[in-house]
């Protein structure tokens, strides 16, 4: 394990103030948190940070757009939805790195809120609602859940819960974010079976390219190590373009690429607040979305520890965690107002990039945020992303969701896996987080579930109330909510030492509470 570099000035690599004596998981820190590389280099490094998470930034709006039927009913708005994600990501990242926890961590759309969003969309689709109504309901649910997150963060509640959120809880929650999305339509869409020669192989090409560049060619050139997802998407997309132009793919094929939409896209797209209409507030949808927000808070809790470890500094204090969660709540609030249909949270992909490149500079991430903000308003870019065929998006999902599941399970390195207690809790949480949502999906929808609840003996009249049954349905359909609740309950009631649960391992590397100064404290000093 290498020592953190502490030599160098503004343009040289150094460790951040208060850095730990050792770098937790990285072999080096090329640029510390407080370092400012030259502007030209910072722009390239900042854009690189965003390229590492562009797959997720693109995957989420495309998943939402597909579920809402936007590709068929409003293909022109798909590009605007993608652009909105980039704008929100840029603003949220600037806010977090400047006045939040001040870690070099990118903020953007979160998979933890995708599952409840898809459940909400499914419930509304059964009622015949259009995509704008769906987005308005998603906006309301996100805004309401975000307000609660802001309160939890800035009142210090998240820091106070630190001793209750061990890796035993965090691991299954993050893992289920990826595992619970294995059957999204872009992967399991039955139309693939009807055109297997034109679609399954394109999906396989996408996955195979990502595997090739990330696992086999990563040692041959840095570009393969840094951008395997992006290169894999580009390779598969170029193949689809060639087949579309040559006529092998017809406009009716799911592999067809329509470049005409890119040429007709406005140069500057109108990404504005409340662009889909006024938010609608439904309690059941809020409850389901808050389960996703809660999962994102737990995920960010683990991400803060990871980014500190890879940046060569001490683990976050309760104070830093509180300010980070509070700012993520404000980011979610902004995302709800802008109408992404999703929220904003810390990106594990960005943290992994720090470990690979050793670039942990806050300044670099801020430069990249400005680049992403500008790109979000550039219409042709968003529309170009929207041309990705469904099989390519499905291949991207397989790679991304699998990576997220693995990141979650990696938190178990801190716990005693020889303990039958820990193995039981993690196993039960993971299984329930997959089984219960599968059961909910087989009930026939929220309406059929309500009828079933109403027929329950004795308490049926209570469970059959629409707001109650809808809340149970949405929460029960969200894997990370189910698994997280079970893990939290068992981990804090079944006997186990703090060392056994992995809490001591985190406490041993935590920074002092006085080491972090909030934005307002810095302004007053």
Locate each region found by the language model.
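Transmembrane helix-bundle signature of multi-pass membrane transporters/permeases
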Residues: 83-86, 90, 108, 142-146, ...
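Hydrophobic alpha-helical bundle architecture
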Residues: 68, 97-101, 333-337, 347-438, ...
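C-terminal ends of transmembrane helices
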Residues: 91-103, 148-162, 211-221, 304-312, ...
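Membrane-embedded helical hairpins/re-entrant loop segments and their flanking transmembrane helices
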Residues: 34, 39-41, 65-102, 288-362
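Early transmembrane hairpin of solute transport permeases
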Residues: 41-208, 377-381, 387, 391, ...
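Lipid-exposed faces of alpha-helical membrane segments in multi-pass integral membrane proteins
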Residues: 88-91, 95, 144, 148-151, ...
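Haloarchaeal acidic low-complexity proteome signature biased toward cell-envelope/secretome components but also
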Residues: 1-41, 497-525
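Flexible hinge motifs at transmembrane-helix junctions and intramembrane kinks/re-entrant loops
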Residues: 2-8, 72, 194-199, 209-298, ...
């Amino acid at each position: 394990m290498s020592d953190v570099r502490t030599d160098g000035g503004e343009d040289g690599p150094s460790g951040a103030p208060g850095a730990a004596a050792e770098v937790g998981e990285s072999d080096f820190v090329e640029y510390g948190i407080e370092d400012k590389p030259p502007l030209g280099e910072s722009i390239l490094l900042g854009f690189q940070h965003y390229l590492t998470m562009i797959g997720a930034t693109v995957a989420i709006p495309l998943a939402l757009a597909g579920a809402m039927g936007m590709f068929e009913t409003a293909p022109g708005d798909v590009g605007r939805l993608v652009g909105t994600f980039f704008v929100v990501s840029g603003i949220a990242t600037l806010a977090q790195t400047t006045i939040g926890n001040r870690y070099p961590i990118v903020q953007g759309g979160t998979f933890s809120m995708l599952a409840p969003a898809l459940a909400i969309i499914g419930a509304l689709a059964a009622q015949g609602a259009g995509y704008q109504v769906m987005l308005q309901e998603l906006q309301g649910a996100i805004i309401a859940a975000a307000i609660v997150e802001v309160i939890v963060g800035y009142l210090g509640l998240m820091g106070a819960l630190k001793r209750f959120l061990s890796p035993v809880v965090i691991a299954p929650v993050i893992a289920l974010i990826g595992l619970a999305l294995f059957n999204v339509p872009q992967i399991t869409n039955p139309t693939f079976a009807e055109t297997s020669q034109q679609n399954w192989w394109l999906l396989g090409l996408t996955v195979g390219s990502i595997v090739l560049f990330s696992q086999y060619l990563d040692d041959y050139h840095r570009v393969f190590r840094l951008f395997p997802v992006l290169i894999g998407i580009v390779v598969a997309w170029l193949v689809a373009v060639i087949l579309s132009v040559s006529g092998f793919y017809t406009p009716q094929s799911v592999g067809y690429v329509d470049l005409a939409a890119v040429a007709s896209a406005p140069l500057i797209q109108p990404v504005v607040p409340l662009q889909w209409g006024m938010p609608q507030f439904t309690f059941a949808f809020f409850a389901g979305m808050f389960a996703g927000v809660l999962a994102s808070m737990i995920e960010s809790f683990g991400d803060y520890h990871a980014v500190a470890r890879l940046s060569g500094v001490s683990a976050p204090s309760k104070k830093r965690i509180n300010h980070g969660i509070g700012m993520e709540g404000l980011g979610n609030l902004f995302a709800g107002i802008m109408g992404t249909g999703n929220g904003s949270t810390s990106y594990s992909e960005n943290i992994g990039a720090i470990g690979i490149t050793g670039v942990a500079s806050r300044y670099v991430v801020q430069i990249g945020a400005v680049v992403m903000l500008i790109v979000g308003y550039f219409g042709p870019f968003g529309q170009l992303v929207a041309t990705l065929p469904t099989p390519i998006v499905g291949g991207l999902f397989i790679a991304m969701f699998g990576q997220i599941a693995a990141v979650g399970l990696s938190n178990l390195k801190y716990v005693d896996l020889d303990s039958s207690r820990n193995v039981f809790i993690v196993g039960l949480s993971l299984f329930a987080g997959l089984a219960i949502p599968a059961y909910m999906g087989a009930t026939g929808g929220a309406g059929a579930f309500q009828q079933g609840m109403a027929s329950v003996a004795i308490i049926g009249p209570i469970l059959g109330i629409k707001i109650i049954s809808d809340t149970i349905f949405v929460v029960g359909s969200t894997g990370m909510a189910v698994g997280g609740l079970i893990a939290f309950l068992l981990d804090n009631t079944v006997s186990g030492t703090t060392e056994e649960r992995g809490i001591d391992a985190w406490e041993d590397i935590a920074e002092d509470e006085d080491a972090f100064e909030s934005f307002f404290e810095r302004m007053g000093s």
